[in-house]
């Protein structure tokens, strides 16, 4: 790598992979459905667009980046859009984390608690909480005797 390569280096774009992007967008009517479909049909690299209004789900297949598709849907339609946060019921490991059961989830799906940072992980007691709970225990000989 010489001086010439450093000075005249062109930024090579990373090749995009063919992928299937699933997005959750609330659609109330056929007009919303059409607007969501039209917002991504014109994107470069899109080969197939599928809209499922019952599940509020938009599926885009092609050589696209998921973040750019979500941004385009939000910008063109003015609707809140996010990557599909649900996974099939059989895929989630047991025991289920709190927040995995989402009432808005389609039948047969639960929220992907492992990939979703908004869902709280299992609650753990901090060191202070452990000290306070053991301080008033009957099993502890050094516990408070006033109570």
From Swiss-Prot:
Annotated compartments: Membrane
Lipidation (S-farnesyl cysteine): 144
SUPFAM superfamilies: HMA, heavy metal-associated domain (SSF55008)
Propeptide stretch(es), residue numbers: 145-147
Source organism, top-level taxon: Eukaryota
Keyword set includes Lipoprotein: yes
A matching Pfam family: HMA
Residue(s) carrying Cysteine methyl ester: 144
Chief localisation class: membrane
InterPro entries: HMA_dom, HMA_dom_sf
Residues spanning the membrane: none
The HMA domain, residue ranges: 18-82
Quaternary state and interactors: Interacts with UBP16. Interacts with ZHD11/HB29.
Function: Heavy-metal-binding protein. Binds cadmium. May be involved in cadmium transport and play a role in cadmium detoxification.
The protein's name in its UniProt record: Heavy metal-associated isoprenylated plant protein 27
Gene name linked to the record: HIPP27
């Amino acid at each position: 790598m010489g001086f010439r390569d450093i000075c005249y280096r062109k930024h090579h774009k990373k090749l995009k992979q063919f992928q299937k992007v699933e997005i959750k967008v609330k659609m109330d009517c056929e007009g919303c459905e059409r607007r969501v479909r039209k917002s991504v049909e014109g994107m470069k690299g899109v080969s197939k667009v599928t809209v499922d209004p019952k599940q509020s789900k938009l599926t885009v297949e092609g050589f696209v980046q998921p973040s750019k598709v979500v941004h385009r849907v939000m910008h063109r339609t003015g609707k809140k859009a996010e990557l599909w946060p649900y996974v099939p019921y059989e895929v989630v490991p047991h025991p289920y984390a709190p927040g995995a059961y989402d009432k808005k989830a389609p039948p047969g799906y639960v929220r992907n608690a492992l990939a979703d940072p908004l869902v709280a992980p299992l609650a753990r007691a901090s060191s202070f909480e452990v000290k306070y709970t053991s301080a008033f225990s009957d099993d502890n000989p050094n516990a408070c005797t006033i109570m």
